[in-house]
C-alpha cells in the first residue's frame, strides 16, 4: 500500500452562507432561503482539533470547502486556519469562498502570516455587482472584490473562480484582463 494515500482532506466546517445562489443544493430555488433539510451548524473547534491530532503525516493539503456553506462564515475561521497550518506536513490550505465575508485586513493578515501556504479560491461571477448578484445573490460584490484584491497584494496563492452563465459570458475577456493585473 502506498504512503501517499491520504494526502488531501476536505473539511466542511460550516453550513452557514449569506449567499442565496439559486442552483446551490443548500438553497430553495423558489424562495432563495436555505432548504428545510439543512441544519445550520459550525464544526466545533474541539472536533477539528481532535481530527487534526489523528491525521497521518502523509497529509499534505487541507481544504475548507464551501459545499453547503462558506467557510468564512465560521466565527473561529482564524483558529481553524492556524490549527490546520500548525501541522508540519501540511503544505497548503485551500479555502473556497464567495469573498463577501470578513474584511481586507483579515485577508492581508492571513497573507502576511502564511503566504503561499494558503490558496484562496474566490467565487466571483462577474465584474460588477449586478452581474455577480444574478447567481451569487446576497453577496456584497464590493466587499468580495476588495477582499480578493487585498489577498492579491500578499503572497497568498489566489484563484478567481468565474462561473460562466448566459448573463456574464460577455465579461470573460475583461475578467481575464483584470486577473492579469
Provide a role label for each language-model segment.
Residues 93, 148-171:
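Conserved strand-turn element in the central/C-terminal portion of the radical SAM core barrel
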Residues 87, 153-154, 181:
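Secondary-structure boundary elements
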Residues 1-119, 130-142, 146:
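Conserved alpha-helical substructure of the radical SAM core
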Residues 76-84, 121-124, 169-181:
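Short, electropositive alpha-helical surface patch
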Amino acid at each position: 500500500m502506498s504512503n501517499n494515500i491520504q494526502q488531501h482532506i476536505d473539511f466542511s466546517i460550516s453550513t452557514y452562507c449569506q449567499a442565496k445562489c439559486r442552483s446551490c443544493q443548500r438553497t430553495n430555488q423558489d424562495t432563495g432561503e436555505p432548504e428545510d433539510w439543512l441544519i445550520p451548524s459550525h464544526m466545533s473547534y474541539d472536533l477539528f482539533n481532535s481530527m487534526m491530532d489523528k491525521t497521518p503525516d502523509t497529509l499534505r493539503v487541507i481544504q475548507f470547502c464551501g459545499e453547503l456553506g462558506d467557510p468564512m462564515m465560521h466565527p473561529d475561521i482564524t483558529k481553524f486556519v492556524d490549527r490546520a497550518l500548525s501541522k508540519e506536513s501540511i503544505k497548503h490550505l485551500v479555502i473556497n469562498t464567495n469573498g463577501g465575508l470578513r474584511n481586507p485586513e483579515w485577508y492581508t493578515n492571513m497573507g502576511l502570516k502564511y503566504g503561499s501556504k494558503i490558496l484562496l479560491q474566490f467565487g466571483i461571477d462577474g465584474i460588477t455587482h449586478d452581474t455577480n448578484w444574478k447567481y451569487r445573490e446576497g453577496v456584497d460584490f464590493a466587499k468580495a472584490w476588495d477582499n480578493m484584491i487585498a489577498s492579491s497584494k500578499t503572497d497568498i496563492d489566489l484563484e478567481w473562480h468565474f462561473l460562466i452563465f448566459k448573463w456574464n459570458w460577455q465579461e470573460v475577456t475583461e475578467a481575464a484582463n483584470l486577473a492579469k493585473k
